[in-house]
């Protein structure tokens, strides 16, 4: 499921409200190595293009990215980064037209719904208010609905900015992974053949119970202060409260504290980043019988001291992450309730040959927070009870290293070649639980339960890969990326493909019409099921996800009428403020395996519009 396109699938031009991302991004938790295949893949480059040092004039406009529309989620460990690097285009001849302050987007399809809203209110002198709302859902058997609303407010003072934010969200979904498989005996081969042919149809007929329908709620409020860019010492301090809850079962109360300080003199920086989270569980129902208070509180602390050099053609960041986790289930060290997990944070980028060749290296590590929210967000279909009472440890990656080159043979083509190595500890391996059933006599069948269990394994992963980015003015963009992985571990490697390929093509036919194709491919994976006695391996078929879309951009309102009557001047046309779009997802109607027993929906579509104001 994590780099991303810096243009939206629908290529919404001029959408503003960057402050929403600015403050909320700082409040985000670190996430483990987990990627999602999305219908709209939004990537942000870690390493910039080879020609990043440029004297050409550029117009930079703030944007807020609309909600990602993700319908097929796969457990691929690392998805190849499909990045649109900022290749040089024609210089700006005229002043850019005034950007829009907000947008609203809505779409309906089968079986999907989508809604987005964002508005940026800036008086030009002092306070800034950003309001946003996002909703996306697919319905039916594989229901998955995500909704989030919130606001951010910033008020500048002479030496610092004061800001606060509040948001809330809901995730509602079905644990629809019920299916049947035949046991090792039956009446005759014809019965087995009948079952193999029709077992998917039988699975769709199994009714969901209330236990299979889950709602998770989140809410957060935070306040912070940050220095303005003119200060010699840059700092940011933020504190907040958040809650993650499954009604009737458990609520996790979180206290989150961030801090960052940076002292700099010209090209040299020395600083530190600090993050602390205290989690307190409020148990309900049958979970209240858990006696040990260690089950009910978990605490995470991270500090990263660093040195950074920022030259004209070289950038170096050298730091070390020092993670300490307290609470039940810390299996990383001999003391089961305490873990200490150091990891490097080193980034290097050097422009070897100006405009056409750079080299980069990233050596990083990561330790999870160990919170219940992180536990459930990694895989919503797992058993929540186990995340509270069973000894477990957040995933720990002591090192994840990558070295690569960006090569620009000519102005519109950018190539990337990279290789890497990662050592990952306590990685989750998903297991489908089955139980005996005699619903379809005379066959003795096994019914899968909707909840997935898990165990931990240590893996090592090598990889080689690359990208091809082609950009012809504003008419064609092509991105082809892929990785091949070399896996080894203390057990067989499950839930992870040996290769991945992503292909994205955007084409502009004229100023109104544009089309795109977004595709993802991955090798087959192994999965496990457990019937209470034996583990069984299953081969999941390769993933093929093909998506396509078309959009029509137009101008409506006074700006459009004024531009038509002013065609003899050099004034640029107003930016399109209305986009109509049609998106066809998974048009091969291939139901890819997400986890064993969980398959993605088949062909589906979205028809909608975006209006910017």
Where are these regions (language model features)?
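N-terminal periplasmic/intermembrane-space "pro-region" immediately following the signal or transit peptide
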Residues: 26-94
């Amino acid at each position: 499921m994590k780099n991303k396109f810096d243009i939206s699938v629908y290529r919404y031009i001029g959408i503003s409200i960057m402050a929403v991302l600015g403050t909320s991004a700082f409040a985000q938790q670190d996430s483990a190595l987990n990627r999602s295949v999305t219908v709209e893949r939004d990537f942000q480059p870690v390493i910039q293009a080879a020609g990043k040092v440029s004297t050409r004039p550029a117009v930079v406009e703030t944007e807020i990215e609309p909600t990602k529309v993700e319908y097929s989620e796969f457990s691929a460990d690392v998805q190849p980064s499909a990045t649109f690097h900022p290749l040089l285009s024609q210089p700006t001849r005229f002043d850019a037209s005034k950007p829009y302050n907000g947008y609203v987007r809505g779409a309906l399809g089968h079986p999907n719904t989508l809604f987005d809203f964002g508005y940026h209110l800036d008086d030009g002198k002092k306070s800034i208010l950003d309001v946003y709302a996002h909703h996306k859902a697919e319905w039916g058997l594989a229901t998955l609905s995500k909704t989030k609303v919130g606001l951010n407010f910033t008020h500048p003072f002479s030496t610092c900015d004061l800001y606060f934010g509040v948001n809330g969200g809901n995730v509602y979904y079905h644990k629809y992974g019920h299916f049947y498989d035949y046991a090792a005996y039956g009446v005759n081969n014809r019965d087995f053949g009948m079952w193999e042919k029709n077992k998917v149809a039988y699975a769709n007929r199994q009714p969901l119970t209330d236990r299979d329908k889950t709602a998770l709620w989140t809410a957060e409020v935070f306040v912070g202060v940050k220095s303005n860019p003119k200060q010699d010492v840059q700092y940011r301090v933020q504190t907040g409260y958040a809650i993650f809850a499954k009604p009737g079962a458990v609520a996790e109360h979180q206290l989150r504290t961030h801090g960052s300080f940076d002292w700099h003199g010209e090209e040299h920086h020395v600083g530190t980043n600090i993050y602390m989270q205290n989690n307190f569980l409020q148990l309900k129902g049958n979970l209240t019988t858990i006696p040990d208070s260690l089950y009910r509180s978990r605490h995470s602390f991270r500090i990263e001291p660093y040195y950074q050099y920022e030259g004209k053609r070289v950038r170096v960041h050298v730091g070390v992450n020092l993670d300490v986790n307290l609470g039940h289930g810390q299996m990383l060290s001999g003391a089961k309730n305490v873990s200490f997990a150091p990891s490097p944070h080193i980034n290097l980028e050097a422009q070897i040959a100006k405009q056409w060749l750079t080299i980069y290296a990233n050596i990083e590590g990561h330790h999870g927070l160990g919170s219940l929210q992180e536990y459930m967000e990694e895989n919503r279909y797992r058993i929540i009870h186990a995340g509270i009472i069973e000894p477990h440890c957040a995933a720990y990656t002591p090192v994840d290293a990558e070295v690569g080159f960006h090569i620009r043979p000519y102005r519109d083509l950018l190539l990337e070649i990279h290789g890497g190595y990662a050592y990952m500890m306590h990685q989750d391996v998903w297991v489908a639980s089955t139980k005996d059933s005699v619903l379809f006599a005379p066959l003795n069948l096994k019914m899968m339960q909707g909840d997935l269990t898990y165990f931990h394994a240590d893996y090592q992963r090598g990889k080689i890969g690359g990208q091809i980015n082609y950009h012809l003015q504003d008419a064609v963009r092509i991105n082809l990326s892929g990785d091949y992985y070399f896996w080894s571990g203390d057990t067989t490697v499950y839930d992870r493909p040996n290769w991945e390929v992503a292909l994205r093509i955007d084409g502009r036919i004229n100023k109104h019409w544009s089309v795109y194709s977004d595709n993802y491919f991955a090798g087959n994976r192994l999965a496990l099921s457990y019937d209470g006695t034996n583990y069984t391996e299953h081969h999941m078929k390769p993933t093929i996800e093909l998506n396509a879309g078309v959009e029509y951009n137009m101008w409506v309102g006074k700006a459009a009428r004024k531009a038509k009557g002013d065609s003899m001047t050099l004034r640029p046309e107003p930016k399109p403020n209305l986009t109509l779009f049609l998106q066809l997802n998974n048009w091969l109607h291939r139901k890819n395996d997400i986890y064993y027993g969980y398959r993605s929906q088949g062909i589906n579509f979205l028809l909608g519009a975006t209006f910017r104001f």
